[in-house]
């Protein structure tokens, strides 16, 4: 794998996905980019038990696209882009769709990774594929919750034949 052409882009509200992204980037010597919303999420926004919380409202509208704080990911410089996020309502938060729709991922390999308190990827990859150009290769990665060593992460990346 050409490590100089790899980016780990991630969205994290509580720090769990940030830690996973940083560990992955360190293990494969990749650059890191944080996907940030223009309006940061508050703890109240993330209350999944409240049907009127910001995250609940956004996730109940599959066409909703939260604005990004910036579009400085320099996608053109990378061949492989890991995209990480927490699983919300069994799929990726809609800000991931915003990110994927905001750049030209043509000819890129996109490898998903996620963190989750209990659910798996579900239909995440299929839902995100719709936000990518047809010639972008989307790979459903794995959950990177806790306990993966740098060697485990490198082995996983090597198994992807990037």
Write out the residue ranges for each language-model feature:
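Glycine-rich, N-terminal phosphate-binding loop of Rossmann-like dinucleotide-binding domains
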Residues: 85-86
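Acidic catalytic loop of the alpha/beta-hydrolase fold
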Residues: 89-90, 118
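Short, glycine-/small-residue-rich phosphate/pyrophosphate-handling segment
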Residues: 111-148
């Amino acid at each position: 794998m050409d490590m100089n052409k790899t980016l780990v882009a991630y969205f994290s509200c509580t720090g769990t996905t940030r830690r996973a992204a940083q560990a992955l980037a360190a293990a494969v010597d990749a650059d890191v980019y944080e996907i940030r919303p223009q309006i940061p999420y508050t703890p109240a926004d993330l209350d999944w038990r409240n049907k009127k919380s910001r995250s609940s409202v956004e996730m109940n509208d599959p066409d909703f696209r939260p604005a990004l704080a910036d579009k400085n990911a320099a996608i053109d410089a990378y061949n492989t882009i890991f995209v990480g996020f927490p699983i919300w309502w069994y799929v990726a938060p809609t800000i991931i769709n915003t990110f994927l729709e905001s750049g030209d991922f043509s000819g890129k390999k996109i490898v998903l990774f996620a963190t989750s308190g209990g659910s798996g990827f579900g239909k995440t990859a299929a839902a995100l594929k719709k936000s990518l150009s047809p010639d972008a290769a989307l790979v459903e990665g794995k959950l990177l919750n806790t306990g993966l060593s740098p060697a485990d992460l490198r082995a996983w990346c090597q198994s992807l034949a990037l």
